[in-house]
C-alpha cells in the first residue's frame, strides 16, 4: 500500500514554491513515482472559491488542503503543497494530521526580490493601496 510523504512548502507569494514543486514533481515522475501537487492557489480557485482571505478563512483553506492530502495519501508516493500557510497554528494542525511523513519547508526571499518578481501583480496592487492585507507586505506572517 502507498503512503505518501507530504512536503508542505510555505513562504510568501512569488517566492518560488510552485515553481520548485512542479520542477521536483517532474524529476520524480521521470523516476516512476506518482506525484501530486496541491497548489494552494489552484485548490482555492477550484474547490474553495467561496473562501476569502480573513484569518479564519485562510486557516479553513489550509485545513481543507490538509484533508485533501489525507484523502489522496494512499494514491500517490509524494504530495507537494505549495501554499503561503502564514499561520503557525495551521501548519501545526497540518503536521498533526499528516505525520508521520510530513515535512514543512519554508521558502524565503527579501521583499525587494518579491516585488521585482511579482508574477501575479499582488505587490504592485499592495504598493498602490489597492490590495489590503497582503501576507508579508501589509499583513502578518507568523
Language model regions located:
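Conserved substrate/cofactor phosphate-moiety recognition/catalytic segment
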Residues: 15, 21-72
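Phosphate-binding P-loop
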Residues: 1-4
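Conserved beta-strand/loop subsegment of P-loop NTPase cores
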Residues: 102-107
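P-loop (Walker A) phosphate-binding loop of NTP-binding proteins
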Residues: 12
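Glycine-rich phosphate-binding loop used to anchor ATP phosphates in small-molecule kinases
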Residues: 54-99, 123-125, 133-134
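Small-molecule kinase domains that catalyze NTP-dependent phosphoryl transfer to phosphate-bearing small molecules
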Residues: 108-111, 116-142
Amino acid at each position: 500500500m502507498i503512503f505518501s510523504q507530504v512536503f508542505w512548502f510555505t513562504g510568501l507569494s512569488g517566492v518560488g514554491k510552485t515553481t520548485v514543486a512542479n520542477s521536483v514533481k517532474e524529476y520524480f515522475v521521470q523516476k516512476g513515482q506518482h506525484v501530486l501537487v496541491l497548489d494552494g492557489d489552484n485548490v482555492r480557485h477550484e474547490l474553495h472559491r467561496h473562501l476569502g482571505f480573513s484569518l479564519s478563512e485562510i486557516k479553513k483553506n489550509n485545513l481543507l488542503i490538509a484533508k485533501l492530502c489525507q484523502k489522496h495519501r494512499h494514491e500517490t508516493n509524494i504530495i507537494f503543497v505549495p501554499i503561503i500557510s502564514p499561520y503557525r497554528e495551521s501548519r501545526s494542525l497540518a503536521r498533526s494530521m499528516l505525520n508521520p511523513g510530513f515535512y514543512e519547508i519554508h521558502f524565503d526571499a527579501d521583499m525587494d526580490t518579491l516585488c521585482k518578481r511579482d508574477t501575479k501583480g499582488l505587490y504592485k496592487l499592495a504598493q498602490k493601496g489597492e490590495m489590503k492585507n497582503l501576507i508579508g507586505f501589509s499583513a502578518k506572517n507568523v
